[in-house]
UniProtKB/Swiss-Prot annotation:
Top-level taxon of origin: Bacteria
Native source organism of the sequence: Erwinia tasmaniensis (strain DSM 17950 / CFBP 7177 / CIP 109463 / NCPPB 4357 / Et1/99)
Span of the signal peptide: none
Official protein name in the record: Peptide methionine sulfoxide reductase MsrB
Gene3D superfamilies for this protein: Peptide methionine sulfoxide reductase (2.170.150.20)
Active site: 118
PANTHER family: METHIONINE SULFOXIDE REDUCTASE, METHIONINE-R-SULFOXIDE REDUCTASE B1
GO biological process: protein repair; response to oxidative stress
Amino acid sequence: MAKQDNSSSHENTLTEMQRYVTQEHGTEPPYSGKLLHNKDEGIYHCLICRAPLFLSDSKYDSGCGWPSFYQPFSPEAIRYLEDDSHGMQRVEIRCGSCDAHLGHVFPDGPQPTGERFCVNSASLSFTDDNGNKTLG
């Protein structure tokens, strides 16, 4: 999949942090995200294209400082890339629809998957079961 440039269509609506995270592969400071402590039932979407990424049922408190999920909404929801930046070997996760940076996945999550999808709040929007929307 070719990387799409999402910045131009959202240039005037993204905050500096949202742009930094989704377009420049940045990371928000730990414990700073608006959706970290969200416990409402609903769906987490890509902030850029609104594709569904995670269900609230798969969210858990990993203690890492970012929203954590043990599985994506669907296998196609997430794109995986090797990330050797900062002297570490990690797996970057991006939106499977628009290629926006989301965070990283680690093999230290709970069952049933054993995976921890560590996601920047700034890359997400959340819609609760009543249709109310919150931006990360």
